[in-house]
Design a protein with these regions (language model features):
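Residues forming the flavin
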Residues: 1-200
């Protein structure tokens, strides 16, 4: 576009003892333990919700569901003066001497925002220590045309059902070589759909 961008953008410099990227079980536990010891902590999550795999997996921690435990830990972290908790914030650069760069989306999700709210903020963070707890990714089975619409990782289908309440198909075929796909099959079954499983 040739029109001038009227949005506001900011940059910020920050220092911390520990930067934790990712808010799944490992990231939350790491940030919480460090914060309780008095360290200055920044917790960064690129999605809008905290919890990572805890939002999808049927796990129990301290007699709470994974989601409830994540919510409890985030609530406690936000109350601590030595902790900065950021969602919609992606750490994308890791440079010499623990200098990291984080991209925070501050305004695009807001229906209404003040004229002083920036659209995005770029953080330059110097840290003593860094924990990269960005989670694991399901290992896909590679085959021709596996990038066509309707083909997805079983973990993606499970996330759609558990987190967003979206059923991704009525006659799913689950092609797998490990146990994790069976959790997705069970979730389909819980939603009234009978999946076909091809297990190598």
């Amino acid at each position: 576009s040739v029109e001038k961008d009227k949005e506001r953008y900011e940059h910020k410099f920050e220092y911390c003892d520990l930067l934790v990227t990712g808010s799944g079980p490992a990231g939350l536990a790491s940030a919480y333990a460090a914060a309780k010891s008095g360290a200055k902590v920044i917790l960064a999550e690129d999605k809008h919700r905290f919890g990572g795999s805890l939002l999808m997996d049927d796990v129990s921690i301290d007699n709470l569901s994974g989601k409830d435990w994540a919510d409890k830990i985030i609530s406690e972290l936000r109350e601590m003066p030595n902790v900065i908790v950021k969602n919609r914030s992606q750490v994308f650069g890791y440079y010499d001497h623990n200098m990291l760069v984080m991209f925070e989306r501050t305004g695009d999700h807001l229906e209404k925002k003040s004229e002083f709210t920036p659209r995005q903020r770029l953080w330059y963070i110097r840290c003593k220590e860094v924990i990269l707890s960005t989670g694991s990714i399901e290992r896909p089975i590679v085959f021709g045309n596996n990038d066509t619409p309707g083909v997805m990782l079983s973990s993606g289908a499970k996330e759609y059902m558990k987190v967003y309440g979206v059923l991704v198909g009525r006659k799913p075929i689950i092609f797998t070589n490990n146990d994790s796909a069976y959790e997705t099959a069970i979730e389909f079954k819980n939603n009234g759909v009978d999946p076909l499983i091809l297990d190598t």
